Amino acid sequence: MKRIKSGDEVIVIAGKSKGHIGKVLRVVDDAVVVEGGNLIKKHIKPNPQKPENKGGIIAREAPLHVSNVAHYNPVTKKADKVGFKYLESNGVSKKVRYYKSNNEIIDRI
């Protein structure tokens, strides 16, 4: 089980977007794409075969390494470490993630 999943709220702790809080749009190997974070300008060449592609300069999110982001705890309003523990429900134990500062569970059971 990975510490950061798609849909988690994270804070950028290093880089040009340091301090930015946003949702994880997708996870790619050891990199994450954060909504509104690490924006780059991409130059698009016009393509006459595709009328929707007019070309120009667009801003989009670039991936960040997972070591440069941390989970954002909405209760403490700070970056937080994530731990794993097993919870039992209906006789089946399930591995869940939780915030280490206040033991609040991140995953839904």
UniProtKB/Swiss-Prot annotation:
Keyword Protein biosynthesis on this protein? Answer: no
Against Pfam families, the record matches this protein to: KOW, ribosomal_L24
Single GO term (MF): structural constituent of ribosome
- Output the SUPFAM superfamilies linked to this UniProt entry: Translation proteins SH3-like domain
Q: Which GO terms describe its cellular component?
A: ribonucleoprotein complex; ribosome
Respond yes or no to whether keyword Chaperone is given for this record: no
InterPro entries, sorted: KOW, Rib_uL2_dom2, Ribosomal_uL24, Ribosomal_uL24_CS, Ribosomal_uL24_KOW, Translation_prot_SH3-like_sf
Output the GO biological process annotations, alphabetical, semicolon-separated: translation
Q: Which domain of life is it from?
A: Bacteria
Its biological purpose: One of two assembly initiator proteins, it binds directly to the 5'-end of the 23S rRNA, where it nucleates assembly of the 50S subunit. One of the proteins that surrounds the polypeptide exit tunnel on the outside of the subunit.
Q: How does it assemble?
A: Part of the 50S ribosomal subunit.
Write down what this protein is called: Large ribosomal subunit protein uL24
- UniProt organism field: Legionella pneumophila (strain Paris)
- The organism's taxonomic lineage, starting at the top: Bacteria, Pseudomonadati, Pseudomonadota, Gammaproteobacteria, Legionellales
